[in-house]
């Protein structure tokens, strides 16, 4: 039987997790697949070897010279200005992301989550609630598990994290519930302006209709304004306002008000994760799951049950009265500010990496108020140093390497302190991704225990 992709010449750009998953999916369906990545070179790892054995042609260290593809599939980390993508867009060759490719095959309803910060925690929290409510749930997307890997299986629901990069290449993607958490400057190296970034995020609801729901953060003016643009039904959440319709905080409890009826869900004291940003994530989770049809009782059980996610304010160990916390997923200044506001204890901060086009001014002011000592590391350490000096903060040292940064943090920390890895920058100057950075931090800390 001829399928949609049989004998079709398809170029997959980017040989990371989602690119590999897309190539594997397409080769199984009889496509002629070329997987290309200009940043990779030979020799290849076992997974790529296996793909090559299955018939995927690998072009690494550059792009194919013969431009004969009929469809291009782009990985989320690859800019649309890259040569083969720009060529395809100019020539009218279809360009899809891995999420769009998977969506065409998936039958399960999707709750999709986007925003600058809190995506991974909220996506995972929603997944936890749905599982407790009895739905066979897949948690996927920009969270380490490509959606395309899940299309062979039957699911009742999908909780999906989507980035602005992934939303750039959707065509028909239509989530049952779309969640927009917040918007602060990030990825301006790619989107150029905050408006361009907002526009990319707002693509999450472009294919919705009145049978779908758009969950928006009422406290973020830019996100709130999207309520006038979405074709879906709007359901707001707020930490600050008592809403006529939506999810909010009243007398220390999370409350849902819908169709004139009010229901208390949980006392905020009983939420398992610290910090005001996690209250925001919890409110978004309640709004999304309520919109999906989950009962208040099951939402409460799911909220309580959640253990948090790796690399996001993850407690690693307490050694000699010092708490070590891995927040490697804090890859922009706003995320690190939220991490700093999660603790009452004095903080020794490890920060630095590759800047994604952000200003460190506001973070520097927050560090001045909250941080006892800062260790600067990575490519943007000089930028951070300048920002700290501009606000009159001089309690910092510069580390020679990541290992040196952790060693210095240990030496500077006192009993009662938190040593917080929250870099406010990407990991690509020293690591493959933020996970690798976080894993090394955890290993170095746990070696202290054994040492």
UniProtKB/Swiss-Prot annotation:
Keywords: ATP-binding, Cell cycle, Cell division, Cell shape, Cell wall biogenesis/degradation, Cytoplasm, Ligase, Nucleotide-binding, Peptidoglycan synthesis
Protein name stated in the entry: UDP-N-acetylmuramoylalanine--D-glutamate ligase
Gene: murD
One CC-aspect GO term: cytoplasm
InterPro entries: Mur-like_cat_sf, Mur_ligase_C, Mur_ligase_C_dom_sf, Mur_ligase_cen, MurD
Pfam family of the protein (one): Mur_ligase_C
Record function comment: Cell wall formation. Catalyzes the addition of glutamate to the nucleotide precursor UDP-N-acetylmuramoyl-L-alanine (UMA).
UniProt KW Cell division keyword: yes
Protein's organism: Carboxydothermus hydrogenoformans (strain ATCC BAA-161 / DSM 6008 / Z-2901)
Molecular function terms, GO-annotated: ATP binding; UDP-N-acetylmuramoylalanine-D-glutamate ligase activity
Keyword ATP-binding: yes
Residues reported in the UniProt entry to bind ATP: 115-121
Pathway the protein contributes to: Cell wall biogenesis; peptidoglycan biosynthesis
Entry similarity comment: Belongs to the MurCDEF family.
Subcellular location: Cytoplasm
Top-rank EC class of the record's enzyme: ligase
Any one biological process term the GO annotation gives: cell division
The enzyme's E.C. designation: 6.3.2.9
